[in-house]
Amino acid sequence: MKKLSTYLFLLLFSFQTSSWADDISDFQIEGMSIGDSLLDYFTEKKIKKFFKADYYTNNEYTTIESLQLPSFEVYEYVAVTYYTKDKNYKIQGIVGDIDFPDNIGDCYKEKDKVVEQISELFSNAKKQNRNFKHNYDKTGNSKVNQTSFYLDEGAVAVSCFDWSEEYNDKNYPDGLRVSITTSNLSAWYRNKAYK
């Protein structure tokens, strides 16, 4: 638990922001920001070799998943999303994950702590709490508990994913996720990604 508390402390400071920042690109996850080029971090050859998510039915965006680098201090995994046709690989979304296998209760507790602290950072943002079934699990047994902070240029979300036993068995552990997305990417997730 001490390690997790350290993660959460670092999680908040990994945004590298102040309470006065109102530009979504001011926030970082593991040093990466919205609007950065992936080419600033990886060669094009390396980018093309990364695992690409294949569960979206619409391919307007590409998500590189399961990035794990020795320099990462907070997250077990990082995912980055960019426009599929963008040759500069400009980042449109960043996600950081911490697993809570078989322990969704602790995920909820830690999410509440993170949300409270992020609420202070985004005091002027519109805040929304939601519980919903994950679109990817057609059985409806996988659930998401999410708090979103809406900014002019995008959103920050803190979520606990409670995957069904079937998906846990497919190596989908329950976990905490912090994400930063542009407004366009958020709209794509809502309206096109799974349709």
Locate the predicted segments by residue.
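Sec-dependent N-terminal signal peptides
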Residues: 4-16
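Sterically constrained small-residue positions within well-ordered secondary structures
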Residues: 12, 71, 85-87, 138-140, ...
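Compositionally biased P/S/T/G-rich terminal and signal peptide-adjacent segments
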Residues: 67-90
